[in-house]
A protein has these predicted regions:
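Short, small-residue-biased leader/transition segments that mark boundaries at the very start
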Residues: 1-3
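A glycine- and small/hydrophobic-rich beta-loop-beta segment
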Residues: 7-70
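A glycine-rich phosphate-binding loop feature that marks nucleotide/adenosyl-phosphate handling sites
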Residues: 13-18, 75, 123-128
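Active-site lining segments that contact anionic ligands and/or coordinate catalytic metals
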Residues: 21-23, 74-78, 114, 125
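Beta-strand secondary-structure signal
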Residues: 25-27, 80, 127-129
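Structural motif
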Residues: 57-65, 75, 84-95
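C-terminal functional modules
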Residues: 90-134
């Protein structure tokens, strides 16, 4: 893991920036998935705090064993999997606990597509199965 190895880090100053804030991006890539954690600066928030917040989220993801899908990727992959389920294919993934956004996305997909989305919570891991509605 590269968390303490500065050779895998890149700090870039932008000449003529178009905004007043900073951005922190942490990408964690593995053989099957790539997760990107983003923090954007805001007025009255120190750059160090922005970085700490993003690092906290990245460390939480790294600390989850056998959970390839992060918090904000879950809702994004539900749409193509939902479309596949509407065509008769069943698929699943394991994620961190779903966000409210993902749960809302689940409800919308079930309303507009003829699919069922099952959620099985197993400790900190959540298995999501998207299948054709029976």
């Amino acid at each position: 893991m590269c968390i303490r190895d500065r050779s895998c880090c890149n700090v870039r100053e932008v000449a003529n920036p178009r905004g007043p804030g900073n951005a922190v991006l942490i990408e964690i890539a593995s053989s099957g998935v790539s997760e990107l954690f983003v923090g954007l600066g805001a007025p009255q928030i120190r750059a160090e705090q922005v970085a700490r917040n993003v690092l906290k989220k990245a460390k939480a993801y790294i600390g989850m064993e056998n959970v390839p899908v992060g918090l904000h990727l879950a809702d994004q992959i539900m749409l193509p999997m939902g479309l596949a389920a509407a065509q008769g294919e069943t698929s699943s993934f394991v994620s961190m606990p779903l966000t409210q956004h993902s749960l809302t996305h689940k409800t919308i997909l079930e309303l507009f597509l003829d699919v069922a989305i099952d959620i099985e919570e197993n400790g900190p891991a959540t298995k999501v199965t998207i299948r054709p509605r029976a």
